[in-house]
Amino acid sequence: MHLPSLSVALALVSSSLALPQTVLPESDVSSHAAAVKEAFSHAWDGYMKYAFPHDELLPISNSYGDSRNGWGASAVDALSTAIVMRNATIVNQILDHIAKIDYSKTSDTVSLFETTIRYLGGMLSGYDLLKGPAADLVKDSTKVDMLLQQSKNLGDVLKFAFDTPSGVPYNNINITSHGNDGATTNGLAVTGTLVLEWTRLSDLTGDQEYAKLSQRAESYLLAPQPSSGEPFPGLVGSEISIQTGQFTNGFVSWNGGSDSFYEYLMKMYVYDPKRFATYKDRWVAAAESSIDHLASSPASRPDLTFLATYNKGSLGLSSQHLACFDGGSYLLGGTVLDRADLIDFGLKLVDGCAETYHQTLTGIGPESFGWDEKSVPADQKEFYERAGFYVQSGAYILRPEVIESFYYAYRVTGKKQYRDWVWNAFVNINKYCRTGSGFAGLTDVNAVNGGNRYDNQESFLFAEVMKYAYLTHAPGMSPISIADEDKANESRG
């Protein structure tokens, strides 16, 4: 997964939390924010010139891709960031495009998960912002109302995926034939990263069907069966039977495939504490169990902390860029619950993931890394001794999770170091990934110049990387309160 992101009204963190802030000199704030806006506009202009209305820009060949069903994923994913940046021109361009999308038509298989987090999340967050703090950006209110109608249209197209014996949905579906790929299981993250957007859709439309469908699927994750599917309190396996709703393994991880299930537990509680107190309880159990059973420090760098995986009595000493949202999740949960211990542990996780950026040649973190001293590649022994990890996959595909957690750390602590880390990451992405028309991924972050480049610009560059970088440096921490900032972060990206 990419992330999340936060999610719609999503992680409605109340501004009454009174998070501490530090203030940059206005000139520095303005120049950093302006640089991020320029990078966003650069990527957007390239997308519009060479790829619109397709899903993504191919920023080296100056062509386009349609990996997300050809509905214009980059445009929809960019909406909330364009709103936060108060770019009315781009906002209205995107609204005009969304009004023309026919979500009932595609020649490709549809991913329920990806379509929910990019399209449904993108439209709902845009709707909330344009009905609230950014209402002045769009003069024609019917264009904003269209976002909710299109969200409902999309939900109606997708909802047959939940028509299974258990209510656990199929992920890969054919919206024309109402068929599926014949899978017997669905993943933890895929099943557990629908409930926020689908619940929000019900709350906005008054039609409870969407919430009921997603919450029924979630119910199996909140009360896992059999007991082997929950090796530690709150920590559950990675695969669920579509037929029965039971867990089919006990593989525990905060990595891709499981990650955003844990992320959404706390965000559901923040969204509505009265309705979703159980989600909070499950997140707390998972967070505490992770501290007790998954926290791991490299032998060469005992000052660092990562979350290991667990399976059948053994820890796996490896992690992913995707998992680096974990520090931000602890910081959000710890702040909302007034738990200093969870905040402190979250900052340890942030520091660990920060090193995956600080130690590479590009200053950008790898797709996956390990710290098992018995498995260090021969050509990385010196690097491991210094850095505390070794690179497993050196790719960088414009993922946001590390910057996301830096952003949380800055908002929670007010410490300049975290804002600087966001800025340094942004500068390095701008340096090594930028092309003439946009931003490309890197094949090896620990090679000179990042190795070669991937000819693809993921939509979550717009939805998350640029948004977190901008919000960290926006003058006055942006004119939108922290509650509304989190509305903006609907799309996980």
UniProtKB/Swiss-Prot annotation:
Catalytic activity of the protein? N(4)-(alpha-D-Man-(1->2)-alpha-D-Man-(1->2)-alpha-D-Man-(1->3)-[alpha-D-Man-(1->2)-alpha-D-Man-(1->3)-[alpha-D-Man-(1->2)-alpha-D-Man-(1->6)]-alpha-D-Man-(1->6)]-beta-D-Man-(1->4)-beta-D-GlcNAc-(1->4)-beta-D-GlcNAc)-L-asparaginyl-[protein] (N-glucan mannose isomer 9A1,2,3B1,2,3) + 4 H2O = N(4)-(alpha-D-Man-(1->3)-[alpha-D-Man-(1->3)-[alpha-D-Man-(1->6)]-alpha-D-Man-(1->6)]-beta-D-Man-(1->4)-beta-D-GlcNAc-(1->4)-beta-D-GlcNAc)-L-asparaginyl-[protein] (N-glucan mannose isomer 5A1,2) + 4 beta-D-mannose; N(4)-(alpha-D-Man-(1->2)-alpha-D-Man-(1->2)-alpha-D-Man-(1->3)-[alpha-D-Man-(1->3)-[alpha-D-Man-(1->2)-alpha-D-Man-(1->6)]-alpha-D-Man-(1->6)]-beta-D-Man-(1->4)-beta-D-GlcNAc-(1->4)-beta-D-GlcNAc)-L-asparaginyl-[protein] (N-glucan mannose isomer 8A1,2,3B1,3) + 3 H2O = N(4)-(alpha-D-Man-(1->3)-[alpha-D-Man-(1->3)-[alpha-D-Man-(1->6)]-alpha-D-Man-(1->6)]-beta-D-Man-(1->4)-beta-D-GlcNAc-(1->4)-beta-D-GlcNAc)-L-asparaginyl-[protein] (N-glucan mannose isomer 5A1,2) + 3 beta-D-mannose
The record's GO CC annotations read: cytoplasmic vesicle lumen; endoplasmic reticulum; membrane
| MF (Gene Ontology) | calcium ion binding; mannosyl-oligosaccharide 1,2-alpha-mannosidase activity
Identify its protein family: Belongs to the glycosyl hydrolase 47 family.
Q: Where in the cell is it found?
A: Cytoplasmic vesicle lumen
Would you tell me the protein name for this molecule? Probable mannosyl-oligosaccharide alpha-1,2-mannosidase 1B
Pathway given in the UniProt record: Protein modification; protein glycosylation
Q: What does this protein do?
A: Involved in the maturation of Asn-linked oligosaccharides. Progressively trims alpha-1,2-linked mannose residues from Man(9)GlcNAc(2) to produce Man(5)GlcNAc(2).
Superkingdom of this protein's organism: Eukaryota
Q: Which residues form the active site?
A: 367
* Taxonomic lineage of the native organism: Eukaryota, Fungi, Dikarya, Ascomycota, Pezizomycotina
Signal peptide segment? 1-18
Names of required cofactors: Ca(2+); Mg(2+)
Q: What class of enzyme is it?
A: hydrolase
Protein's UniProt keywords contain Hydrolase: yes
